[in-house]
Amino acid sequence: MSANRRQLRGSQRINKSKGKRKEYSKILIVAEGEKTEPQYFEKFAALLKAKAVRVVRLDPIGLGKDPLSVVLDADKRRKKERRDGDAFDQVWCVVDVDEHAGLERACIEAGRLDIKIAISSPCFEIWLLWHFEERTAWVDAATLARELKKRGFSGKSIPTGFPYANYVAAMNRANKCEQVRIKHAPPNPSSSVASLISALVTAYTEPIKT
């Protein structure tokens, strides 16, 4: 068994069948984070052998803390792919709450453009911590950074051996927190990254019938 498969042991398996080639959803993920978020989704997609998933790392220079820019960038990339005749089936943006004054506008625009948005409060690191333990009480970004450092994190890099296979536990822990009812004002802690993970797992365990 390969190292990749061992990391996802116990999770849903990809249904591979010989013969007729299956077509899978083509998914675009545009991540606001400079390193952590793209690294997580690139690795997760690789473990799923999700070759039709494209993860985009946005250059933070000139972007600032503006989730609307993430949404607009995703729409731009989707339009280009559509013009090239190979449209995405799903488009996702991954952003943090942090101190985003423009989050409401970004959510409105994402809804108008039919782009899904995964928001974490206070930041994406809460989703990472849920792979290790339950956390339902209010928490800030600095505390999350300290907790993850105890688990081998160094700066924004995800350590080798991170338990990606614990994504189901992370989803369950996210569900125990107050649910996101108003997208631009999610409770702390919370994360709708679980919805994105669910979309990826579903797309790559249940091939689209052609």
Tell what function each PLM region has.
Residues G33-T36:
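Short acidic, Gly/Ser-rich segments with clustered Asp/Glu that frequently serve as metal-coordination loops
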Residues V70-K80:
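Glycine-rich, highly charged phosphate/nucleotide-binding loops
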